[in-house]
Amino acid sequence: MLIIRNRQELKEAILKQKKANKTIGFVPTMGFLHEGHMTLVSHARKETDFVVMSVFVNPTQFGPNEDFDAYPRDEAHDAKLAEEGGVDILFVPTVEEIYPTELATKLHVIKRVSVLDGADREGHFDGVVTVLTKLFHLVNPDNAYFGQKDAQQVAVVSGLVEDYFFPVNLRIIPTVREADGLAKSSRNVYLTETERKEAPVIHAALQLGRQLIDSGETDEAKIVQVMTDKINEQTSHEKIAYLALYSYPEFTPVTDWTKGIIIAAAVKYSKARLIDNELINVKRR
């Protein structure tokens, strides 16, 4: 496995693979890798000839009161897991390498972001599409791999790819979970022992919502209330940041219960904000 830190070296390595007619799979991450990330790598390994992973904590997707400086980082750990997982190139740039000068242009997401994380984290998805635009140009992948846990991000990135004709196929991989149902996340390390014990209730509540919809329930308020009551059976969380249903991938009110729907939750704990979701009537790419 090659560890590359600068753009030019990465572009040269990618060009070499392209000249050899190798297909490239790309797994963009912010590091502190866990089994969820490695599942993406596993899919890339099976579906493409050459796997590139980026580890970059992107400052432009963090708000002024968010955890950029505190976000967990462990390059040695990441490199070990990446190599064991079959990554061919680990791209670990500095902030200066990705943002060498002040931006002269700005990407602004105008759809699919008025609710959920888009509403709670103003400017977050602008930062996401900015860094992914840069990374897609550098890596020039055939496939890019994302986890369903970040379903709103996936919808936004799908819009980016469609709007700007990026020649990349997005592969959306089901959320990887702990044995008790908690979605794997780098932020799980922030949970206290009690919070970690109770956090699986998020997934349990979402499953209740799915069961209601699958049984024919269309009273949105009732569905949300049942899920809210389930989460509030546990007491370690500070608040439910959101618990809602929307059409997917549009993130507009549900008008047709036979089409794509997302049930999404974000729950705030003392030092972590956890997100999770269930997708209904949605085909993964």
From Swiss-Prot:
**MF annotations from Gene Ontology:** ATP binding; pantoate-beta-alanine ligase activity
Catalytic residues, per the record, are 37
Q: Which reaction does it catalyse?
A: (R)-pantoate + beta-alanine + ATP = (R)-pantothenate + AMP + diphosphate + H(+)
State where the protein is found.
Cytoplasm
Q: What class of enzyme is it?
A: ligase
Q: Which UniProt keywords apply?
A: ATP-binding, Cytoplasm, Ligase, Nucleotide-binding, Pantothenate biosynthesis
State the superkingdom: Bacteria
What pathway does the annotation place this protein in? Cofactor biosynthesis; (R)-pantothenate biosynthesis; (R)-pantothenate from (R)-pantoate and beta-alanine: step 1/1
Name the Gene Ontology biological process terms: pantothenate biosynthetic process
- SUPFAM superfamilies in the cross-refs: Nucleotidylyl transferase (SSF52374)
Q: Name one Pfam family in it.
A: Pantoate_ligase
What EC identifiers does the entry list? 6.3.2.1
Task: Provide the primary localization.
Answer: cytoplasm
**So where does (R)-pantoate get bound?**
61, 153
Q: Which residues bind ATP?
A: 30-37, 147-150, 176, 184-187
The reply to whether Membrane figures as a keyword in the UniProt entry is no
The positions annotated for binding beta-alanine are: 61
A single cellular component GO annotation: cytosol
NCBIfam families noted in UniProt = cyt_tran_rel, panC
As a miscellaneous remark, the entry gives: The reaction proceeds by a bi uni uni bi ping pong mechanism.
Q: How does it assemble?
A: Homodimer.
The UniProt entry, under HAMAP family, shows: PanC (MF_00158)
Query: What is this protein's function per UniProt?
Result: Catalyzes the condensation of pantoate with beta-alanine in an ATP-dependent reaction via a pantoyl-adenylate intermediate.
The entry assigns this protein to a family as follows: Belongs to the pantothenate synthetase family.
Q: Could you identify this protein by its name?
A: Pantothenate synthetase
